[in-house]
A protein has these predicted regions:
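Hydrophobic beta-strand segments of well-ordered beta-sheets in folded domains
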Residues: 6-14, 38, 102-105, 136-148, ...
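Extended, basic/helix-rich recognition subdomains
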Residues: 226-314, 372
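Active-site metal-binding core of divalent-cation-utilizing nuclease and nuclease-like domains
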Residues: 43-99, 334-377
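Nuclease catalytic cores
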Residues: 9-25, 276-348
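Anionic, Ser/Thr-rich low-complexity intrinsically disordered regions
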Residues: 11, 18-33, 88, 142
Length: 455
């Protein structure tokens, strides 16, 4: 899109932990009064690629130019429970990993109330409370964004509780479906809580789901008792703070209580199922980072020390990683992407023809990218790996490992041939020929300098 020289140019930087997506960028810019037209899509996000005598070289970042808006996009790695996206003005410096001057912070998910009440709302709040704890003086606009998710006309009580806590903590809520941005606070007439008593009454009024251990709250004078299970109750996570939805909820209500009360409160956590040896190890935890200096006691346990808050919120991604390789391959290939899982970026379904989708189970093994070539009637499953982990990537492409996922693909595309390949990050693209005879072909290679090839 042409940039008019008569309009003053504006420059921004977006930092993201995920593959850059236009919907999140639009919502962040809209939050500060800058509108990106509906006609702008992910195709307008251009990889920063240069060419020399050696070949094409990716600079590890992207650019988006819309009218007078110039947006530079970079990947970052969080040092704690970091938000998914951050928007900064052009004067920001990133070498110290300080996010206090962010204009907007945004957490994104595709999970909705109908698919998972707790992970869609409560689990996400800890990202915001952690940021607020680290940067209490920040003026960043906080945005929770449900991207490409479907919400019913009537919310569950659990979702209403989570929405009201978000509103109490000044978190803006938006969803997007079929290109439309929806203000969730307005759609569902969400109101913030006005007192600690109101939070307690509302939470205790929610009926217990059969088979679940409900969270219950009570207050006696200046002490608030919170009965909440904080471990997963099995395996390596038994006795450890590991129940992410409940951790998010606990962080949310503690911070909401603190905001609404005039007099300092003491909080006693009961029925938590956390063992003393967990606290003795003083583990770094997003929970501790999100409730710094709040007076909290775990019944039956002694907390001798709390982990210190990290000095840095993030570091910029400076190396060519598996995630960068799969994101770049996804962007330079012209085929339709029907599934992507770039380094854990959330995508919970496979796209079929005519807007048909099939959900991928949370524990189902999955590849990094799946492409569709309608001309050849082919589906291409891609696994991204670092050079030293190629053998692992080959195993993960096996029919045995991907049995459930391939079954979903065959349901959606019974007439298509399924092929497999690797997307690798290697020391130098000059060495690519040594992988010509492995079980699955190398479809894309990115080296440590940023040079890439489509073999």
């Amino acid at each position: 899109m042409e940039i008019s020289s008569s309009i003053p140019q504006k420059y921004f930087t977006v930092l993201t932990e995920e593959a850059p997506n236009i919907d999140e960028i639009k919502v962040m810019l809209k939050s500060i009064g800058e509108i990106i037209p509906d006609t702008i899509s992910n195709k307008n996000i251009i990889s920063n690629i240069t060419t020399d005598k050696k070949g094409n070289m990716f600079k590890g970042e992207w650019n988006l130019k819309v009218n007078n808006l110039n947006i530079n996009i970079k990947l970052f790695k969080g040092k704690t429970s970091s938000i998914d996206y951050m928007l900064f003005d052009d004067n920001s410096k990133f070498e110290h990993g300080n996010a206090s001057n962010a204009l907007v912070i945004l957490e994104s998910t595709k999970t909705s109330d109908s698919s998972s009440r707790n992970t869609a709302v409560n689990q996400r709040i800890v990202k915001f409370t952690t940021y607020d704890t680290m940067y209490p003086e920040s003026n960043a606009i906080k945005v929770m964004f449900w991207c490409d998710s479907i919400w019913n006309d009537k919310l569950t009580d659990t979702a209403i509780m989570g929405f009201r806590l978000m509103d109490t903590l000044d978190i803006n809520m938006y969803s997007q479906h079929n290109g439309n941005i929806i203000n969730m606070k307005e759609k569902y007439n969400i109101l913030p809580f006005s007192s600690c008593d109101e939070i307690i009454k509302f939470k205790n009024s929610i009926k217990q789901k059969k088979g679940n251990i409900s969270i219950r709250l009570s207050i006696i004078e200046n002490i608030i008792n919170i009965s909440i299970k904080l471990d997963k109750g099995y395996g390596k996570d038994f006795g450890r703070i590991s129940h992410d939805p409940n951790v998010g909820f606990l962080s949310a209500i503690l911070n909401a209580f603190e905001k609404l009360t005039i007099n300092p409160k003491k909080y006693i956590i009961k029925n938590h199922n956390i063992e003393q040896k967990y606290f003795d190890s003083n583990p770094k935890s997003k929970f501790w980072f999100s409730i710094n200096e709040i007076d909290i006691e775990f019944e039956g346990c002694i907390i001798k020390d709390r982990p210190e808050i990290p000095e840095r919120y993030f570091t910029l991604e400076t190396e060519m990683t598996e995630k960068l390789a799969t994101i770049l391959y996804d962007q330079v290939l012209s085929y339709e992407t029907i599934f992507s899982n770039h380094g854990g970026c959330a995508l919970t379904y496979i796209k079929g023809h005519n807007d048909i989708i099939l959900s991928v189970g949370q524990k189902m093994p999955r590849p990094d990218i799946v492409f569709r070539n309608d001309e050849r009637k082919e589906i291409e499953i891609i696994e991204g790996k670092l050079e030293r982990e190629l053998s692992k990537g080959i195993k993960q492409l096996s029919d045995t490992h991907l049995k459930g996922f391939i079954g979903l693909l065959k349901q959606l595309y019974p007439d298509y041939t399924i092929k497999k390949g690797l997307c690798i990050t290697i020391s130098s693209i000059d060495c690519i020929n040594k992988y010509s005879d492995i079980e699955f072909p190398v479809k894309f290679a990115l080296d440590n300098e940023g040079y890439f090839i489509l073999p």
